[in-house]
Regions:
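Active-site- and interface-proximal helix/loop "cap" or "latch" segments in soluble metabolic
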Residues: 23-120
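A short, basic/flexible loop-to-alpha-helix module at the beginning of a structural domain
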Residues: 115-133
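Conserved beta-strand-loop-beta-strand element in the redox core of flavoprotein oxidoreductases
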Residues: 290-306
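Gram-negative bacterial Sec-dependent N-terminal signal peptides
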Residues: 1-21
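N-terminal Rossmann-like FAD-binding beta1-loop-alpha1 element of flavoenzymes
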Residues: 131-161
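Sec-exported extracytoplasmic/periplasmic mature domains
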Residues: 78, 82, 103-111, 154, ...
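Conserved N-terminal/central alpha/beta ligand/cofactor-binding core
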Residues: 167-279, 283-288, 295
């Protein structure tokens, strides 16, 4: 009698498991969830009861920041057969939206999301030391870091650019990509502004900053802006043009905007950098400087693998 009861229990368990697997339908199903900038729609393809493909089909998330999550999260869901994968650093809201939308798609397929959930994996540190020998290391891929890396590489100095996030651009990626053209050929010949000067730009910037700006840095920026703009437009062919709106705090026509805003600037500059042999290390955070003979001779850094 006991043996028969056990057999009955096993049969019931198998039937329940079989029913759970059969409940989810094969096909492609969509789900939507709110991201940072609005709805994110994800298409999930189910084959033989497994997640065969995940694709973001509609998103208004921030360029490059959201792109990092859009590229990684769907692939990891498929690889791990789990809706509980780790968020992408710096793109947590987009990551969560993709996972929530995928969860809704699984529900639409008749599946039970909990059956597709495994706790996120915390990868152990690899503790593998890797050394790179190069002429120049640039830390951070914002506008200034990217420009420094490109300039260095084009000047014949082998350069490595490291970025702690899984996307390029830093805070620059969130702005409109404007800069001042003071002292540039472009300002004189295209914008037809002849009354501007580094001294006037310095005065305007210090005024709007209520004289809290670092005067040394402001002086350097206003005196070097013209040559930088000419380099970007004439040499690198970055698509800058007069900004749609000239800020009222500027007493001369000097505001430029880049076509496609900052994401296009960063994409274009990074392509120039790598096309000329530059190396980029993503998710790599500088931790300390290496000194030799009283001078900085390198850096220590750690990547996402530890």
């Amino acid at each position: 009698m006991i043996f028969k009861t056990l057999l009955t229990s096993v049969a019931v368990s198998m039937a329940v498991a079989s029913y759970a697997q059969a409940a989810i339908q094969d096909g492609t199903f969509e789900g939507t969830a709110n991201g940072k900038n609005g709805p994110v729609t994800v298409a999930v393809t189910i084959k033989a009861g497994k997640i065969a493909n995940v694709k973001v089909v509609k998103s208004g998330e921030s360029a490059m920041i959201g792109d990092a999550a859009i590229a990684r999260i769907p692939a990891e869901i498929v690889a791990r057969q789990s809706l509980g994968v780790n968020n992408v650093a710096g793109a947590s809201l987009t990551s969560m939206a993709i996972k929530a939308a995928a969860t809704n798609a699984v529900k639409a397929a008749g599946g039970t999301p909990s059956e597709f959930y495994k706790a996120p994996i915390k990868k152990p540190a690899s503790n593998i030391d890797v050394s790179y020998k190069t002429a120049v290391v640039v830390v951070g891929s914002g506008a200034s870091g990217m420009a420094a890396a490109v300039r260095s590489q084009l000047n014949g100095n082998p350069t490595i650019l490291i970025e702690k996030m899984p996307y390029l651009g830093g805070d620059t990626i969130l702005n409109a990509g404007t800069l001042i053209a003071t002292g540039s050929r472009y300002q004189r010949e295209v914008m037809h502004e002849t009354k501007d000067s580094p001294a006037l730009a310095y005065k305007d910037i210090m005024h709007v900053g209520k004289h809290r700006n670092d005067p040394v840095l402001v002086k350097m920026v206003t005196e070097k802006a013209g040559s930088v703009v000419d380099w970007l437009i004439d040499d690198l062919k970055i698509p800058y043009g007069p900004a749609a709106t000239q800020y009222p705090d500027h007493s001369a026509s000097r505001q430029l905007g880049v076509e496609g805003r900052s994401p296009n600037f960063i994409r274009t500059m990074s392509r120039i950098f790598t096309d000329h042999g530059g190396k980029i290390l993503m998710e790599t955070r500088a931790t300390s400087l290496i000194y030799k003979g009283g001078r900085v001779d390198g850096i220590h850094a750690v990547n996402s693998d530890g």
